[in-house]
């Protein structure tokens, strides 16, 4: 990959901490090269308390836009001039578009999830979903799924720091969408079993099973799986978690978070450039 930077080259970037591990620079720079777009994408390690200064600098310099990873997704919404419906409901964003100094916040994680599910040949519109977790990734999935037309979503989470915030988001979704959303305490396995039995899709939106803890799974009773269930895990390291392996053994179709990552990036890319990311090329080079 080569990049010839001139005085006209536009700036795209990633803000967060840490960011050195991110595949976003390779992915977006490759897409710009393939399409002949004069942008460069860089990663900047910015802690949460420095986000306001970083945003002011990027606004002043005329950066076209940026992605935000942890820990800046919540504060970035407050720094934006406008917010998308999904970002307003969740209170978080992962993408900023700068239009002549006016910053608009978007959330593309949920968009990436919905596209990844569709690419697996699974239709969940008008269906029921069981969602495990209420952190950042799970919330983005919850909000976008409700906005896009999933009929019913049961969210299961332990009573941790995310539970109160999840209650507020669930209330907003029940008021503003036609989706029926219910928040449950994870401690009741029979309620979980009943929900999964009625669901077209089960989503693990937690980090349980992520490397190096690959022997862990959030569903310890595999009799909850059924052959008509699509099981999706937001984790992509490992690509097949214990949850997905055991679901597949039970006859379920499965998918991981790798293409969710790709498609959220593609959604951000289109917001900045107006162009479709060449996802097949990006898949082959960075996601195979």
Region locations from a protein language model:
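Residues in the short beta-alpha loop(s) of Rossmann-like NAD(P)-binding domains
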Residues: 18, 158-162, 237
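Rossmann-like adenosine-cofactor binding region
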Residues: 179-254
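Adenosine-phosphate binding glycine-rich loop
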Residues: 228-230, 234-288
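NAD(P)-binding Rossmann-fold cofactor-contacting core
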Residues: 148-177
């Amino acid at each position: 990959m080569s990049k010839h930077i001139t005085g006209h080259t536009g700036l795209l970037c990633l803000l967060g901490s840490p960011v050195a591990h991110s595949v976003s620079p390779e992915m977006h720079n490759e897409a710009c090269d393939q399409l002949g777009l004069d942008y460069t994408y860089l990663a900047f390690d910015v802690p949460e308390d420095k986000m306001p200064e970083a945003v002011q600098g990027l606004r002043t310099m005329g950066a076209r836009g940026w992605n935000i990873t942890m820990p800046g997704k919540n504060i970035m919404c407050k720094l934006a001039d406008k917010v998308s419906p999904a970002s307003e409901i969740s209170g978080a964003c992962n993408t900023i578009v700068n239009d002549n100094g006016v910053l608009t916040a978007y959330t593309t994680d949920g968009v990436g999830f919905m596209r990844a599910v569709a690419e697996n040949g699974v239709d969940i519109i008008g269906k029921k979903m069981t969602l495990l977790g209420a952190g950042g990734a799970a919330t983005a999935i919850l909000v976008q799924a409700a906005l896009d037309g999933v009929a019913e979503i049961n969210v299961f989470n332990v009573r941790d720091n995310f539970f109160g915030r999840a209650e507020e988001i669930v209330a907003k979704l029940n008021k503003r969408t036609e989706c029926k959303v219910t928040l449950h305490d994870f401690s009741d396995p029979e309620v979980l079993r009943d929900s999964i039995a009625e669901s077209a899709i089960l989503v693990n939106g937690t980090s349980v099973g992520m490397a190096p803890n690959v022997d862990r799974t959030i569903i310890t009773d595999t009799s909850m799986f059924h052959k008509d269930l699509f099981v999706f895990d937001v984790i992509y390291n490992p690509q097949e978690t214990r949850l997905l392996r055991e679901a597949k053994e039970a006859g379920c179709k499965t998918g991981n978070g790798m293409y969710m990552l790709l498609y959220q990036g593609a959604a951000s890319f289109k917001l900045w450039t107006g162009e479709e990311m060449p996802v097949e090329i990006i898949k082959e080079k960075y996601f195979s």
